[in-house]
Amino acid sequence: MKDVALQLKNVGKSYGNKVVLESIDFEVRHGSMVALLGTSGAGKSTLFRCLTGLEPIDSGSIVALGESIHELSPARLRAVRGQIGFVFQQLHLVKRFSALENVLGARLAEMPIWRVTLKSFSRADKVLAFECLDRVGMLDYANTPTQLLSGGQQQRIAIARALAQKPKIIIADEPVSSLDPLTARSVLQTLKAAATDLNVAVLCSLHQVDLAREFGDRIVGMRDGRVVFDGTPAEFTDERVHALYQVPAGKMHQRPRATRSTRWPVWLWHEGRSDDHIHTPHTRAAPGHRTALAPERALQRQTSAGADRRHGAVVRDRTTHRNGPHGGHDGTGRGQDRGPG
């Protein structure tokens, strides 16, 4: 039996006369991923604010790593939060910073991220950041300004930043709500790998039933501020889906998804392309050229390239970043494809 990392016991929360959370009970164990489902207004966002300690609770307790977070002193609460990685729908990445710099920001909890430079970090911190980028498949983009990355890639950077804290718990609030299906699965695979490979307890809120069934070790369903289902994906039958959402289960996947990728023709998805391919960064190397480096080698390259220049901004390879963010060459001798139209 895996140890319990996060446990909610009879949690209640009200705003005036309006009850938002009532008798919430469930737990998340180390090495497992719990998918939290619910309709809009079910209380998921309020619950996540309570989990961060930003909102007080009216009754019950939230126990993280053996400590009730709403009974801790501010100093002790900061220490417990340091062992919890948060991934929010609003990523709070510094867009002008590189992917590497955003991940390194997690290593300096007491310093505002806009004051961070590469000189602020030890060699061990830099190696850890490269390892986290490698784990989420973003090592090739360590030097890339975050504003040039697609939504799915930015989400992976946020996960890498959470992993850089060496967390025992990861709490992800709607991490794939604005992503296309292929990219959403890729991001959830990254979170699932953190649970299985690093023994991290992952709590992830979702809207998509199929994704919850595919990636969750357990599913918790909320409606009207209460937990109405807590069980395995196999137990989450179509009848239980109907009971949770109060609509016929067969209609669940027919809702149109309004994402920023819907302006692209449908054939992009039929060919298996994801959001990452639509918004290709301009630091991708020529076909067949391996740019991924082992963390130690990548760090050596950073150091030799003078990575501490310009307030810590990472110096990019001139051969792969020639003509700015909107066109020109990508290092292959060909122009960038901006998509149809």
UniProtKB/Swiss-Prot annotation:
Q: What is its main location?
A: membrane
Is Membrane tagged as a keyword? yes
Q: Which SMART domains match?
A: AAA
What CDD domains does the entry give?
A: ABC_PhnC_transporter
Question: E.C. number, please?
Answer: 7.6.2.-
Give the Basic and acidic residues compositional bias ranges.
307-320, 327-341
Where do the segments described as Disordered lie?
278-341
Mention one GO molecular function.
Answer: ATP hydrolysis activity
Outline the subunit composition: The complex is composed of two ATP-binding proteins (HtxD), two transmembrane proteins (HtxC and HtxE) and a solute-binding protein (HtxB).
What is the designated name of this protein?
Hypophosphite import ATP-binding protein HtxD
Per the UniProt record, the source organism is Stutzerimonas stutzeri (Pseudomonas stutzeri)
